[in-house]
Amino acid sequence: MSETAAAQPTEATASKATERFRNGGKAVIATLAANGVDTVFGIPGTHNLEFYRHLPEFGIRAVTPRHEQGAGYGADGYFLVSGKPGVVITTSGPGLTNVITAAATAYAESRPMLILSPGVPTGFERADVGMLHETKDSSGALNRLLVSSQRTRTAEGAAQAVAEAFAMFASSRPVPVHIEVP
């Protein structure tokens, strides 16, 4: 399969997912399922429940360790045994930063990992209003450590970012990617 052919199906699945869903969490999970994801790792928390709420609907299993670092290493190990990119769903703030060590390991070993995190609502970025686990610029911080870290603004943008991550895993050096979904 050529690099271009590998990228095309995921772009189509992102469009298909957002045609049906207005919700960013549901669009992300639908796009994960369309890309063959059957397992995610992470800890459900206040800000990421919209991801977890849709997992059963798409037949995706959640593995919930006791610490986010364990989720990151679980996703990395999942790739080693399955050959599929590992997916981590974190909470914002400390939940996200706890995954960084596992992501750095995956980066050094050229292993694909998709890190999904919630973010403050659109319009409140860098507002410093005291929201729970508010961080000034999660994507900016991770962008210095990973090849790609981006914040999406819409359900369509979130699904497209997930599709692009899977296209990148198939067409270039497979390393961790972070997507922040408000």
Residue ranges, per PLM feature:
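N-terminal alpha/beta PP-like core and its mobile active-site loop of ThDP/TPP-dependent enzymes
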Residues: 2-182
